[in-house]
Amino acid sequence: MNKTWKKAATVLAFAGIALSATACSGGKAVVTYKGGKITESQYYDKMKESQAGQSTLASMIVSDALESQYGKDVTQKQVDKEYNKYKKQYGSQFDSVLEQNGMTASTFKDNLKTNLLTEAALKHIKKITPAQEKKAWKNYQPEVTVQHILVSKKSTAEDVIKQLQDGGDFKKLAKKYSTDTATKNDAGKLPAFDSTDSTLDSSFKTAAFKLKTGEITTTPVKTQYGYHVIKMIKHPAKGTFKEHKKQIDNQIYQSMSEDQNVMRSVIATVLKRADVSIKDKDLKNVLSQYVSSDSLSK
């Protein structure tokens, strides 16, 4: 499961167990068998003792609190857009990737919505400072467009570079050598990206940003996927901060979202505003990673 999928899978992963809304109502059987039965109350008692059950309850509380406070900021259209982005990225493997991660299309969409709600909470609760923007702008690189050829062996990449230096055609070499099936038949061309892009390996971006328009990497670029030969198609001037403020702010919030301490603080604020009250003393610590149990048991 790569970084992108992990991100999609989210801030709070849902265990695949549902707690009945009437779980503590008493003796209704959820399972019967020869000589006995398992009641809702028995099931509930076991569930609340388990880590999976407590994690599910915590996820339900956080998700409901986020929905209550920021639901107006997230539309189904946004959720569907995110879903279709991942579906396109994984292509024919999408269903198997869902299965490998223990998800259905429905639960994955739930997770995506939780992500979007969490992003909304982050942007409402944590405000960006001019100092943060100044620091981010210093390291910012605008959108560039590149071609690449991905191979599994360093020696193959070195051979491709030599052929290019001898006048070889990048498009033909990409089709012949590249193992990136998504780009090899399109001259190895990738979608434009800037330094805020989180889908590309950092070493790939670093190597690409050093190139001027028309230049090719003179040594193979190693990433988790193999070895790349990169050609810069378009490398524009940096421009002004005002032109890229939106991207800069998105980058800052992206960094915040990857900081566990920041996100724990955001969720804690959401829970305090929700005035959550844990009625079952056995579950008083279910949200202890965010807030003190004393503030929830009333």
UniProtKB/Swiss-Prot annotation:
Its main location: membrane. It comes from the Bacteria. Pfam families: Rotamase_3. It is a lipid-anchor. It is found in: Cell membrane. A lipid is attached at C24 (N-palmitoyl cysteine). It catalyses: [protein]-peptidylproline (omega=180) = [protein]-peptidylproline (omega=0). Keywords: Cell membrane, Isomerase, Lipoprotein, Membrane, Palmitate, Rotamase, Signal. The keyword Transport does not apply. One of its GO terms (cellular component) is plasma membrane. A lipid is attached at C24 (S-diacylglycerol cysteine). One of its GO terms (molecular function) is peptidyl-prolyl cis-trans isomerase activity. Belongs to the PrsA family. NCBIfam families: PRK04405.1 (NF003356). Plays a major role in protein secretion by helping the post-translocational extracellular folding of several secreted proteins. This is Foldase protein PrsA 1. It comes from Lactobacillus johnsonii (strain CNCM I-12250 / La1 / NCC 533). The gene is prsA1.
